[in-house]
Amino acid sequence: MKLNILKLLNNNNNKNMLLKNMLLKMNINNNNMNTNNNNMKYMNNKLQSINNMNNWSLQMYNYNKNNELNMMMMMNMMNKLLYKLMNMIMINNMTMNVNNKNNNNIIMMKPMYQYMMNKLNIKFYYYINNNNMNTNYYMNMLYKLMNTLNNNNNMYMNNMNNIMSMYINKNINIEMIKLNYVYNNKDIMNKYLSTMDIDTLNNNSTMNLLNNMMTKMNNNNIIMNYMNNMNNMRNNKYINNMSSNYIMNMLMYKYLTGWTILLKGRLNKNMTRTNKYILYNGSNKMNMYMKNNYKLNYISNNHFINNINNVNKNGKYNIKVKLSYI
Protein backbone atom coordinates (compact mmCIF):
# COMPACT_ATOMS: atom_id res chain seq x y z
CA MET A 1 0.00 0.00 0.00
CA LYS A 2 2.81 2.38 0.89
CA LEU A 3 4.61 1.62 -2.34
CA ASN A 4 1.55 2.43 -4.39
CA ILE A 5 1.16 5.75 -2.61
CA LEU A 6 4.79 6.65 -3.26
CA LYS A 7 4.45 5.79 -6.94
CA LEU A 8 1.40 8.00 -7.22
CA LEU A 9 3.22 10.88 -5.54
CA ASN A 10 6.20 10.47 -7.83
CA ASN A 11 3.95 10.45 -10.85
CA ASN A 12 2.23 13.60 -9.67
CA ASN A 13 5.58 15.32 -9.11
CA ASN A 14 6.76 14.31 -12.55
CA LYS A 15 3.59 15.63 -14.11
CA ASN A 16 3.99 18.92 -12.26
CA MET A 17 7.57 19.24 -13.45
CA LEU A 18 6.52 18.51 -17.00
CA LEU A 19 3.79 21.13 -16.80
CA LYS A 20 6.21 23.70 -15.40
CA ASN A 21 8.73 23.01 -18.16
CA MET A 22 6.03 23.26 -20.80
CA LEU A 23 4.76 26.57 -19.39
CA LEU A 24 8.30 27.92 -19.21
CA LYS A 25 8.98 27.04 -22.85
CA MET A 26 5.67 28.53 -23.94
CA ASN A 27 6.48 31.74 -22.09
CA ILE A 28 9.91 31.95 -23.73
CA ASN A 29 8.39 31.39 -27.17
CA ASN A 30 5.76 34.07 -26.57
CA ASN A 31 8.39 36.57 -25.49
CA ASN A 32 10.47 35.84 -28.57
CA MET A 33 7.43 36.27 -30.80
CA ASN A 34 6.57 39.59 -29.16
CA THR A 35 10.09 40.95 -29.59
CA ASN A 36 10.18 39.86 -33.23
CA ASN A 37 6.79 41.46 -33.89
CA ASN A 38 7.94 44.70 -32.28
CA ASN A 39 11.11 44.69 -34.35
CA MET A 40 9.17 44.15 -37.56
CA LYS A 41 6.74 46.88 -36.59
CA TYR A 42 9.57 49.37 -36.13
CA MET A 43 11.37 48.19 -39.23
CA ASN A 44 8.31 48.76 -41.42
CA ASN A 45 7.77 52.19 -39.89
CA LYS A 46 9.62 55.40 -40.78
CA LEU A 47 11.66 55.03 -37.56
CA GLN A 48 10.29 58.32 -36.25
CA SER A 49 8.81 56.72 -33.12
CA ILE A 50 12.15 55.22 -32.13
CA ASN A 51 13.89 58.54 -31.61
CA ASN A 52 12.14 60.26 -28.72
CA MET A 53 14.46 63.28 -28.92
CA ASN A 54 14.58 63.89 -32.64
CA ASN A 55 13.35 67.48 -32.61
CA TRP A 56 12.94 69.30 -29.34
CA SER A 57 13.56 72.82 -28.11
CA LEU A 58 12.22 72.47 -24.56
CA GLN A 59 11.69 69.42 -22.38
CA MET A 60 10.47 69.87 -18.83
CA TYR A 61 8.54 68.09 -16.14
CA ASN A 62 5.39 69.92 -15.03
CA TYR A 63 3.50 69.47 -11.83
CA ASN A 64 1.79 72.87 -11.73
CA LYS A 65 1.27 75.85 -14.02
CA ASN A 66 3.32 78.26 -11.92
CA ASN A 67 6.38 76.05 -12.24
CA GLU A 68 5.96 75.94 -16.01
CA LEU A 69 5.72 79.73 -16.27
CA ASN A 70 8.76 80.21 -14.05
CA MET A 71 10.79 77.82 -16.19
CA MET A 72 9.76 79.63 -19.36
CA MET A 73 10.89 82.94 -17.85
CA MET A 74 14.18 81.41 -16.77
CA MET A 75 14.67 80.01 -20.27
CA ASN A 76 14.25 83.46 -21.85
CA MET A 77 16.69 84.95 -19.36
CA MET A 78 19.31 82.28 -20.04
CA ASN A 79 18.87 82.83 -23.79
CA LYS A 80 19.88 86.45 -23.33
CA LEU A 81 22.87 85.47 -21.19
CA LEU A 82 24.12 83.02 -23.81
CA TYR A 83 23.64 85.54 -26.62
CA LYS A 84 25.62 88.13 -24.68
CA LEU A 85 28.39 85.64 -24.08
CA MET A 86 28.73 84.94 -27.80
CA ASN A 87 28.62 88.67 -28.57
CA MET A 88 31.41 89.32 -26.08
CA ILE A 89 33.58 86.73 -27.81
CA MET A 90 32.97 88.30 -31.20
CA ILE A 91 33.58 91.84 -29.91
CA ASN A 92 36.89 90.69 -28.48
CA ASN A 93 37.71 89.05 -31.80
CA MET A 94 36.89 92.20 -33.76
CA THR A 95 39.05 94.38 -31.53
CA MET A 96 42.00 92.07 -32.16
CA ASN A 97 41.35 91.87 -35.90
CA VAL A 98 40.16 95.28 -37.04
CA ASN A 99 40.70 94.64 -40.75
CA ASN A 100 38.24 91.74 -40.92
CA LYS A 101 35.65 92.94 -38.44
CA ASN A 102 33.00 93.32 -41.11
CA ASN A 103 33.45 89.73 -42.22
CA ASN A 104 33.27 88.02 -38.82
CA ASN A 105 29.85 86.85 -37.83
CA ILE A 106 28.58 84.11 -35.52
CA ILE A 107 25.13 82.75 -36.25
CA MET A 108 23.58 81.01 -33.28
CA MET A 109 20.33 79.09 -33.12
CA LYS A 110 17.89 79.22 -30.24
CA PRO A 111 19.21 77.02 -27.40
CA MET A 112 17.48 73.77 -26.52
CA TYR A 113 16.70 73.01 -22.89
CA GLN A 114 16.10 69.74 -21.13
CA TYR A 115 14.90 70.07 -17.56
CA MET A 116 15.46 67.18 -15.17
CA MET A 117 14.85 66.75 -11.48
CA ASN A 118 18.25 68.04 -10.40
CA LYS A 119 19.95 68.98 -13.66
CA LEU A 120 19.50 71.22 -16.69
CA ASN A 121 21.04 70.44 -20.09
CA ILE A 122 21.49 73.30 -22.56
CA LYS A 123 22.51 72.57 -26.15
CA PHE A 124 22.83 74.95 -29.08
CA TYR A 125 24.39 75.04 -32.55
CA TYR A 126 26.42 77.89 -34.01
CA TYR A 127 28.06 78.70 -37.32
CA ILE A 128 31.00 81.02 -38.00
CA ASN A 129 30.60 83.01 -41.18
CA ASN A 130 34.32 83.66 -41.56
CA ASN A 131 36.80 80.82 -40.97
CA ASN A 132 40.08 82.71 -40.80
CA MET A 133 42.85 81.74 -38.40
CA ASN A 134 42.10 84.51 -35.94
CA THR A 135 38.48 83.43 -35.61
CA ASN A 136 39.50 79.81 -35.11
CA TYR A 137 41.94 80.86 -32.40
CA TYR A 138 39.30 82.69 -30.43
CA MET A 139 36.78 79.90 -30.90
CA ASN A 140 39.31 77.54 -29.34
CA MET A 141 39.44 79.95 -26.43
CA LEU A 142 35.65 79.74 -26.34
CA TYR A 143 35.85 75.96 -26.04
CA LYS A 144 38.12 76.35 -23.03
CA LEU A 145 35.70 78.84 -21.55
CA MET A 146 32.77 76.45 -21.99
CA ASN A 147 34.78 73.71 -20.31
CA THR A 148 35.26 76.08 -17.42
CA LEU A 149 31.54 76.67 -17.30
CA ASN A 150 30.90 72.96 -16.95
CA ASN A 151 33.48 72.52 -14.23
CA ASN A 152 32.08 72.10 -10.72
CA ASN A 153 35.31 72.90 -8.94
CA ASN A 154 35.28 75.48 -6.13
CA MET A 155 37.86 77.55 -8.00
CA TYR A 156 35.18 78.69 -10.45
CA MET A 157 32.50 79.87 -8.05
CA ASN A 158 31.95 83.04 -10.07
CA ASN A 159 31.62 81.40 -13.46
CA MET A 160 28.48 81.53 -15.51
CA ASN A 161 27.45 78.01 -14.71
CA ASN A 162 27.20 78.76 -10.99
CA ILE A 163 25.53 82.09 -11.62
CA MET A 164 22.82 80.45 -13.71
CA SER A 165 22.52 77.62 -11.21
CA MET A 166 21.61 80.07 -8.48
CA TYR A 167 18.46 81.09 -10.33
CA ILE A 168 17.04 77.61 -10.83
CA ASN A 169 18.83 75.59 -8.09
CA LYS A 170 20.03 72.97 -10.56
CA ASN A 171 23.34 71.85 -11.98
CA ILE A 172 23.73 73.19 -15.51
CA ASN A 173 25.50 71.47 -18.38
CA ILE A 174 26.13 73.61 -21.48
CA GLU A 175 26.92 71.87 -24.77
CA MET A 176 27.81 73.98 -27.80
CA ILE A 177 28.19 72.38 -31.23
CA LYS A 178 29.95 74.06 -34.12
CA LEU A 179 28.55 73.47 -37.61
CA ASN A 180 30.93 73.49 -40.55
CA TYR A 181 28.16 74.02 -43.13
CA VAL A 182 25.25 76.39 -42.95
CA TYR A 183 22.75 73.85 -44.29
CA ASN A 184 23.24 71.49 -41.32
CA ASN A 185 20.52 73.36 -39.42
CA LYS A 186 17.41 75.05 -40.80
CA ASP A 187 17.41 77.88 -38.24
CA ILE A 188 21.01 78.80 -38.91
CA MET A 189 20.52 78.69 -42.67
CA ASN A 190 17.50 80.98 -42.36
CA LYS A 191 19.44 83.46 -40.23
CA TYR A 192 22.35 83.26 -42.66
CA LEU A 193 20.08 84.21 -45.55
CA SER A 194 18.55 87.06 -43.55
CA THR A 195 22.02 88.58 -43.07
CA MET A 196 22.54 88.67 -46.84
CA ASP A 197 21.37 91.47 -49.10
CA ILE A 198 17.78 90.59 -49.96
CA ASP A 199 17.88 92.47 -53.27
CA THR A 200 20.64 90.21 -54.59
CA LEU A 201 19.11 86.86 -53.61
CA ASN A 202 17.47 86.46 -57.00
CA ASN A 203 20.69 87.00 -58.96
CA ASN A 204 22.70 84.29 -60.66
CA SER A 205 25.69 84.90 -58.38
CA THR A 206 23.57 84.18 -55.32
CA MET A 207 22.16 81.06 -56.94
CA ASN A 208 25.69 79.84 -57.66
CA LEU A 209 26.64 80.56 -54.04
CA LEU A 210 23.70 78.54 -52.74
CA ASN A 211 24.43 75.70 -55.16
CA ASN A 212 28.05 75.57 -54.02
CA MET A 213 26.94 75.36 -50.40
CA MET A 214 25.08 72.14 -51.13
CA THR A 215 27.21 69.01 -51.27
CA LYS A 216 27.49 67.01 -54.47
CA MET A 217 25.50 63.80 -54.17
CA ASN A 218 26.77 60.43 -55.30
CA ASN A 219 23.87 57.98 -55.39
CA ASN A 220 26.08 54.90 -55.49
CA ASN A 221 27.99 55.95 -52.37
CA ILE A 222 24.76 56.79 -50.53
CA ILE A 223 23.25 53.38 -51.35
CA MET A 224 26.40 51.53 -50.31
CA ASN A 225 26.60 53.44 -47.03
CA TYR A 226 23.00 52.61 -46.20
CA MET A 227 23.52 48.94 -47.01
CA ASN A 228 26.68 48.78 -44.90
CA ASN A 229 24.95 50.44 -41.96
CA MET A 230 22.04 48.01 -42.13
CA ASN A 231 24.41 45.03 -42.27
CA ASN A 232 26.35 46.37 -39.30
CA MET A 233 23.16 46.69 -37.29
CA ARG A 234 22.26 43.09 -38.04
CA ASN A 235 25.66 41.81 -37.08
CA ASN A 236 25.84 43.83 -33.88
CA LYS A 237 22.18 43.12 -32.97
CA TYR A 238 21.49 46.77 -32.22
CA ILE A 239 18.06 46.43 -33.73
CA ASN A 240 16.75 44.69 -30.60
CA ASN A 241 17.65 47.69 -28.46
CA MET A 242 14.70 49.98 -29.06
CA SER A 243 15.50 52.28 -26.15
CA SER A 244 18.51 53.84 -27.89
CA ASN A 245 18.59 56.14 -30.92
CA TYR A 246 21.16 54.06 -32.79
CA ILE A 247 18.90 53.18 -35.72
CA MET A 248 17.74 56.75 -36.24
CA ASN A 249 21.28 58.13 -36.08
CA MET A 250 22.62 55.54 -38.52
CA LEU A 251 19.93 55.61 -41.18
CA MET A 252 18.24 59.01 -41.27
CA TYR A 253 19.14 62.68 -41.90
CA LYS A 254 22.64 62.04 -43.22
CA TYR A 255 22.53 63.57 -46.69
CA LEU A 256 21.04 66.83 -47.91
CA THR A 257 19.03 66.10 -51.05
CA GLY A 258 17.37 69.43 -51.76
CA TRP A 259 16.49 72.89 -50.53
CA THR A 260 13.78 75.45 -51.21
CA ILE A 261 13.85 79.17 -50.37
CA LEU A 262 10.74 81.33 -50.53
CA LEU A 263 11.16 85.13 -50.47
CA LYS A 264 8.05 87.22 -50.07
CA GLY A 265 7.51 90.86 -49.16
CA ARG A 266 7.79 94.48 -50.18
CA LEU A 267 11.33 95.78 -50.25
CA ASN A 268 10.33 99.27 -51.38
CA LYS A 269 7.79 101.58 -49.78
CA ASN A 270 6.57 102.71 -53.21
CA MET A 271 5.55 99.18 -54.19
CA THR A 272 1.84 98.42 -53.93
CA ARG A 273 2.13 94.65 -54.31
CA THR A 274 4.36 92.11 -52.68
CA ASN A 275 6.98 90.28 -54.69
CA LYS A 276 7.48 86.54 -54.40
CA TYR A 277 10.57 84.56 -55.40
CA ILE A 278 11.05 80.80 -55.13
CA LEU A 279 14.53 79.31 -55.35
CA TYR A 280 14.83 75.53 -55.33
CA ASN A 281 17.35 72.85 -56.10
CA GLY A 282 17.81 69.11 -55.78
CA SER A 283 14.90 66.83 -54.96
CA ASN A 284 12.58 69.74 -54.15
CA LYS A 285 12.76 71.05 -57.70
CA MET A 286 10.74 68.25 -59.31
CA ASN A 287 8.11 67.88 -56.60
CA MET A 288 7.42 71.56 -56.01
CA TYR A 289 4.42 72.00 -58.30
CA MET A 290 3.43 68.34 -58.73
CA LYS A 291 2.60 67.48 -55.12
CA ASN A 292 2.58 70.98 -53.61
CA ASN A 293 4.59 69.74 -50.63
CA TYR A 294 5.68 73.22 -49.65
CA LYS A 295 2.54 73.90 -47.59
CA LEU A 296 3.08 73.80 -43.87
CA ASN A 297 0.11 71.47 -43.33
CA TYR A 298 2.12 68.68 -45.02
CA ILE A 299 5.50 68.17 -43.41
CA SER A 300 7.12 64.88 -44.30
CA ASN A 301 9.38 62.95 -42.01
CA ASN A 302 12.54 64.17 -43.71
CA HIS A 303 11.52 67.80 -44.31
CA PHE A 304 12.59 70.63 -42.01
CA ILE A 305 10.91 74.02 -42.46
CA ASN A 306 11.61 77.34 -40.80
CA ASN A 307 10.56 80.90 -41.56
CA ILE A 308 11.61 84.32 -40.30
CA ASN A 309 10.02 87.76 -40.61
CA ASN A 310 11.93 91.02 -40.60
CA VAL A 311 11.25 94.72 -41.01
CA ASN A 312 13.89 97.15 -42.20
CA LYS A 313 14.00 100.63 -43.69
CA ASN A 314 13.11 99.30 -47.15
CA GLY A 315 9.98 97.42 -46.11
CA LYS A 316 8.89 93.99 -44.84
CA TYR A 317 9.95 90.58 -46.02
CA ASN A 318 9.64 86.92 -45.09
CA ILE A 319 12.18 84.14 -45.69
CA LYS A 320 11.05 80.53 -45.55
CA VAL A 321 13.59 77.72 -45.82
CA LYS A 322 12.83 74.05 -46.46
CA LEU A 323 15.59 71.43 -46.27
CA SER A 324 15.18 67.80 -47.30
CA TYR A 325 17.37 65.03 -45.91
CA ILE A 326 17.58 61.28 -46.31
UniProtKB/Swiss-Prot annotation:
BP-aspect Gene Ontology terms: translation
Q: Where in the cell is it found?
A: Mitochondrion
Task: Tell me which GO cellular component terms the UniProt record holds.
Answer: mitochondrion; ribonucleoprotein complex; ribosome
Q: Which UniProt keyword terms apply here?
A: Mitochondrion, Ribonucleoprotein, Ribosomal protein
Task performed by this protein: Essential for mitochondrial protein synthesis and required for the maturation of small ribosomal subunits.
Which family does the entry's similarity section mention?
Answer: Belongs to the universal ribosomal protein uS3 family.
Protein's UniProt name: Small ribosomal subunit protein uS3m
| The species this protein was found in | Naumovozyma castellii
Q: What is the lineage of its organism?
A: Eukaryota, Fungi, Dikarya, Ascomycota, Saccharomycotina
